[in-house]
Structures are given as C-alpha cells and as structure tokens.
Regions:
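Alpha-helical transmembrane segments and their membrane-interface boundaries
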Residues: 1-57, 71-208, 215-291
C-alpha cells in the first residue's frame, strides 16, 4: 500500500533542504565556524527525528541530501540551480514511480509495520549527539580536502551512522563493505562485456537494470534497512551515474572506490567509538546496548 505519510516526508525534506543549502552556503560560507555550528545543529535535529521514529524518513533524507549537497556546492564549478533542481526532480520522480508501481503491482497482503523501539530520553540524546557530531566532522573533512570524486566514501561514512549507536555502526559497516565489493565486481563484469561500447545506452540499460534488480531483491530479502543490498544499489548508481563515460577506466574507479570506502568506514567507526565512550561518561547521554 502506498504510504502518503512517507511520500510527504520525502518531498518536504528535499524542498526544505534546498532552501537550507542556499542559506548556509550562500550566506554563511564566509564564516566557517558559524556555518559549521549551523550544520551541526541541523544534523543533530535530523538524527533526533530518526531516533524518535515517526519522522525517520524526514530525518534520514535530510541527512543524505545535506551531506551530498554541501559537498558539491562547496566547489566553485558546481551549478547550484542544476543541483537543486535535480534533487527535487529525483524526489518527485521517485514518489511518482513508487505510487505507479504500487498501483500496478499491489501487495498480496497488507504489510505489517515494524515493531516500535521504546527509547528513553538519555538514549535519544546519545544517538542524536553521537551521529550529529561524527557527521559534522565528516562535513569538515570534506570541506577542507578536495574529495569531489569520493562520493561513495562520503555516503559510506554517513550511512553507517543510521543505526545511531556503536554496535549498529560496526554491523552496518560490514554490510556496506560487502555490498560495495559485490557491486564493484558486477561493474567489472559489465566493463568486460561492454568494453568501449558504454556510450550505447541500448546495451547498457539491460545490464544496469539487471544489477539493480538483483540488489533490490537482496535488499528486500534482508529486511535490515541499509544492508548489503542497499549498499550495492547505491554503489551501482554512483558508479554508472558518475563514472561511466566513453573510454572511462572503470577498473581504476572500482579499486579506488573500494579503497576509499574502506578508509572512510575505518575512520568513521573510530570516531563513533570515541564519541560513544565520551557520551557514556555522562548520565544524561548514557546508552549501553543490551544483548
């Protein structure tokens, strides 16, 4: 069944995010400290939405769009209008296609909502502060360094924060690595099959669709959110969307992507562990994962 509540969160988050990015990058970029504090506040607010539950998609969409757009808009060669229009266009198309497919291929039986996790105030504060702080550090690193070709590394660091606690981040990072490796191996196979005919869309689309279909099925069967299938979907999308051009060497891109994602995950997990230990020193932000 098509969920209007989810669809509204999806589109509203994209629209609000575009306005925020214009204000942050357009007006606050000349004051880096103030800009960083505003970004931190937005991250904490969005991870708090995710931790509380009902507005999870609003928060998660905001985190992903904020991280991606802040990275691209920091480069002078980026066209803001194209970036924001593409963001809104993609969100509207995703909702419209989802509604269409729900109508054409309805569920056989009603879906049961996942059980809601009861969280105390200390756990919510722990999760929002931990994830918000680490996401802000990632933002600062990508603002200082020239990492415009490391979108997968950026997304890997952000997406493993979605469990919002240390143990969940460790498990998520393992799934992420496996998904990235599987997708990169598939892309290498496509490179061998297509060779230098990648500019022929009629040859590429069936292979891209096959890879996405397999990854989507794996994602649905896992039932764990951002697992192996989800990591594979995002990797295929990024690789084919950004790097598949005529005579582009996807072998180097594959190896670079695996290396950059691994480094990003190790650094992010280290930061998550340190923040987890620090926040657990205070009763107001203490969270101990129970077995």
């Amino acid at each position: 069944m098509f969920n209007l509540h989810v669809a509204r969160q999806f589109i509203f988050s994209a629209a609000v995010n575009c306005v925020e990015m214009v204000l942050i990058v357009g007006y606050l970029s000349q004051w880096p400290v103030i800009m960083t504090l505003v970004v931190f506040a937005l991250y904490v607010m969005r991870f708090r939405f995710m931790s509380q539950g009902p507005l999870f998609l609003l928060g998660s969409m905001g985190v992903v769009c904020q991280s991606t757009m802040l990275n691209f808009m920091s480069y002078p060669t980026s066209n803001w209008h194209t970036l924001m229009f593409s963001n809104m266009e993609a969100c509207v198309m995703a909702v419209a296609l989802s509604a269409l497919l729900h109508y054409l291929i309805p569920d056989v039986e009603p879906r049961k909502p996942p059980p809601r996790i009861e969280k105390d105030a200390a756990r919510i504060r722990h999760e929002s502060l931990l994830s918000g702080t680490v996401a802000t550090i990632i933002f600062v690193v990508f603002q200082i360094c020239d990492l415009s070709d490391s979108l997968s590394a950026l997304m890997a660091g952000i997406l493993i924060l979605f469990p919002m606690h240390y143990r969940g981040a460790v498990i998520s990072s393992i799934w992420r690595v496996v998904g990235v490796v599987l997708a990169c191996l598939y892309i290498l196979v496509v490179q061998l099959i297509i060779y230098d005919f990648s500019n022929h869309m009629i040859l590429m689309m069936p292979l891209i669709g096959l890879g996405l279909a397999f990854s989507a099925r794996l994602h649905v069967m896992e039932k764990v959110g951002a697992g192996v299938g989800f990591a594979s979907i995002t990797t295929i999308g990024i690789m084919f969307g950004q790097n598949l051009h005529p005579y582009q060497d996807l072998v180097f891109s594959d190896l670079y992507r695996i290396t950059s994602v691994t480094v990003s995950l190790v650094v992010t997990l280290t930061l998550v562990f340190l923040m987890h230990r620090l926040l657990n020193c205070f009763a107001a932000t203490r969270f101990v994962v129970s077995d």
